[in-house]
């Protein structure tokens, strides 16, 4: 039985370099990934290196608010 809120939550990771380029209208889009994290093990914001198809390289993807 789970007490309180669920431990595993779904989070959205967004490319940080595409986010900066979208202000200047250089990027074709913003890369986003959906994943899960354990709230007890990682209470802070999640940051992972993932492949961005718009930048054509591996960049840091950070967790965004829903």
UniProtKB/Swiss-Prot annotation:
This entry carries the following GO cellular component terms, namely:
chloroplast; ribonucleoprotein complex; ribosome
Q: Which domain of life is it from?
A: Eukaryota
InterPro entries attached to this UniProt entry: Ribosomal_bL33 (IPR001705), Ribosomal_bL33_CS (IPR018264), Ribosomal_bL33_sf (IPR038584), Ribosomal_zn-bd (IPR011332)
Tell me which Gene3D superfamilies the record gives.
Answer: Ribosomal protein L33
Keyword list, A-Z: Chloroplast, Plastid, Ribonucleoprotein, Ribosomal protein
- Which one GO biological process term can you cite for this protein? translation
GO MF terms listed in the record are: structural constituent of ribosome
Where is the protein localized?
Plastid, Chloroplast
The family database entries (NCBIfam families) matched by this protein are listed as: PRK00504.1, PRK00595.1, rpmG_bact
Q: Which family does it belong to?
A: Belongs to the bacterial ribosomal protein bL33 family.
Annotated protein name in UniProt: Large ribosomal subunit protein bL33c
Source organism of this protein record: Cicer arietinum (Chickpea)
């Amino acid at each position: 039985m789970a007490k309180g809120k669920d431990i595993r939550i779904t989070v959205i990771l967004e490319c940080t370099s595409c986010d900066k380029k979208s202000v200047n209208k250089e990027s074709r889009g913003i890369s986003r990934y959906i994943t899960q994290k354990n709230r007890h093990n990682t209470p802070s914001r999640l940051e992972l290196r993932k492949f961005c198809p718009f930048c054509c390289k591996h960049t840091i993807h950070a967790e965004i608010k829903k």
